């Protein structure tokens, strides 16, 4: 019995700590300011315990550091106000904005090469 409990804890603890790394960084004022500054803006949605969301966030956080003219925001898809603003229904959605317009939308893409290819189209 105690062996089963240890196994369950061993499995669940990493997922719980992994989920804590995700946070909403979206702020409408910062989003608008980044667009006014002429930046390419990337927004992604996530939900707790979504492994593809975590993979996307890892790639997008790295891209945010590598591309000078890029601003990246993330939000919890259960936040209805933000989800409705962008008409996002699913977690792991990536949106790219250029010149105040949505120019790209993807659901579930986690491949770094494909994500960077999409970003490079608009940088």
What are the language-model segments listed below?
Residues 18-37, 120-121:
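N-terminal leader/targeting and pre-domain segments
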Residues 4-13:
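Sec-dependent N-terminal signal peptides
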Residues 52-66:
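Typically the conserved alpha-helix immediately C-terminal to a functionally engaged Cys/Sec
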Residues 45, 68-81:
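Thiol-based oxidoreductase modules, predominantly thioredoxin-like and allied folds used
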Residues 86-95:
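Structural micro-motif
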Residues 28, 57-61, 116-119:
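Extracytoplasmic/secreted envelope proteins and their assembly/folding machinery
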Residues 35-48:
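Short active-site neighborhood of thiol/selenol oxidoreductases, capturing the structured segment around
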Residues 98-123:
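Non-catalytic, surface beta->alpha helical segment in thiol-disulfide oxidoreductase systems
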């Amino acid at each position: 019995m105690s062996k089963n409990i240890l196994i369950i804890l061993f499995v669940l603890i990493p997922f719980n700590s992994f989920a804590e790394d995700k946070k909403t960084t979206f702020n409408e004022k910062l989003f608008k300011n980044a667009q006014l500054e002429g930046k390419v803006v990337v927004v992604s949605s996530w939900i707790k315990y979504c492994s593809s969301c975590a993979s996307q966030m890892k790639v997008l956080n790295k891209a945010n550091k590598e591309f000078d003219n890029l601003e990246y925001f993330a939000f919890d898809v259960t936040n209805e106000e933000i989800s409705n603003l962008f008409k996002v229904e699913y977690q792991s959605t990536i949106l790219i904005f250029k010149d105040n317009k949505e120019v790209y939308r993807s659901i579930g893409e986690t491949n770094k090469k494909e994500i960077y290819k999409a970003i490079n189209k608009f940088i």
